[in-house]
Amino acid sequence: MRADGRARRKGRRAGLIVLAATALAGCGGLGGPAGGTSPLRTVTGGPARAAHRSRPKRHYPSFPVVNGLGTLGPRWHPVVTVRGQTAAWIAQRDGVTMLRFDQRLVRLVLHAGSADPGSGPWQYGDTIRGSERRRLAAAFNAGFKLDTGAGGWQSGGHVAVPLTAGRASIVTYRDGTTDIGAWQHGIPTSQPIASVRQNLSLLVDNGVAAATVNSCIETCWGATIGNAATVARSALGIDANRRLIYAATPSATPATLAQGLIDGGAQRAAELDINPDWVAAYLYHHGRGLPEFLPVIPGQYGVAGHFLAPYTRDFFAIVER
């Protein structure tokens, strides 16, 4: 009986020592000064890490988010995000307003107008609709009317106007990437093609303006209203990082448009349409019903329906990948 009693007393003393040690650990007593890390604290950190790992992922909107134009100036600033990442920026240089697009997040789509090129087996017709509308970030004008002889037009393997060697060409491949260059002089590559829009010669090549931008304005770069050298003009370029740059101005010569693109980083560029009635670009806010349009170019006349209703001319849309 005495031995049993001594054993019970030793057990009680051992229990008290364990409780004391636990209390000291809770007060920082085993790890040094209060607030220090103790072995017991290290063990109890497991559940906290598990809770951190189980934190729910952030959910982004299922459509591009437009942040507004802000103050236009020479510095690029974000205007569109896709899944939390910047997909488009805006800047204004030499009086030229530019939208720059990250092709990893968005892609270019060529639309056929109801009159130009007219009805046909086109996948993308005279208005933006359906799932494309829900992923719409921006849209803007394409090139000259096809009966001017400015170049060819094809989409989805169907040809409206045959392509011409040497013409400035906006080539979109089936993987959704777009390149710009002179047809059969660097483009196309061997990739399957989704669409090609040609217009005149390259306005910018290897970061240099075409030699004719000052000396051959109407003959080389299109007839203008009233034969004016300075009119609304637009272009689409690509920079060294494969980002697309839409550039437009309500009043410029070809030289000014080209310089704006070069200052914005464009390596190659094709002039698009000119004159006030046909130069327009929009960003789109999403909500209920039709997206709300936001004009991009200061002073632009605009397009009836803002590319969300049938339009007679062909145009480009920028949509989320």
Where are these regions (language model features)?
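Aspartyl protease catalytic domain
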Residues: 112-263, 267
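Short beta-strand scaffold segments in enzyme catalytic cores
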Residues: 97-101, 168-172, 234-238, 279-283, ...
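Bacterial N-terminal signal peptides
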Residues: 17-26
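Bacterial N-terminal signal peptides that target proteins for export
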Residues: 4-16
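Active-site neighborhood of phospho(di)ester-bond hydrolases with catalytic His/Asp-centered motifs
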Residues: 269-272
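C-terminal regions of proteins
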Residues: 278-321
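Active-site environment of divalent metal-dependent phosphoester hydrolases
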Residues: 147-148, 276-279
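Zymogen propeptides
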Residues: 28-162
